[in-house]
């Protein structure tokens, strides 16, 4: 019984942890910038828990 409960908890833990905003930015082919986004890039979210901007290309 105890092993079964441990197995259920181990399956639930990775699904409960949300993906960080930095990982989400990198998956969308963005780069993190603490200043303004460079030319030909637009801000589309945050990085480093809201401390930086996620800059992605226009196209």
From Swiss-Prot:
It is found in: Secreted; Cytoplasmic granule. Disulfide bonds join 25-54, 32-47, 37-55. Keywords: Antibiotic, Antimicrobial, Defensin, Disulfide bond, Secreted, Signal. SUPFAM superfamilies: Defensin-like. GO terms for molecular function: CCR6 chemokine receptor binding. It comes from the Eukaryota. GO terms for biological process: defense response to Gram-negative bacterium; defense response to Gram-positive bacterium; innate immune response in mucosa. Residues 1-18 form the signal peptide. One of its GO terms (cellular component) is extracellular space. Belongs to the beta-defensin family. Has bactericidal activity. This is Gallinacin-14. It comes from Gallus gallus (Chicken). The gene is GAL14.
């Amino acid at each position: 019984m105890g092993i079964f409960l441990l197995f259920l908890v181990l399956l639930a833990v990775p699904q409960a942890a949300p993906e960080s905003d930095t990982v989400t930015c990198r998956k969308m082919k963005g780069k993190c910038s603490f200043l303004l986004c460079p030319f030909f890039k637009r801000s589309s979210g945050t990085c480093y828990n809201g401390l930086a901007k996620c800059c992605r290309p226009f196209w």
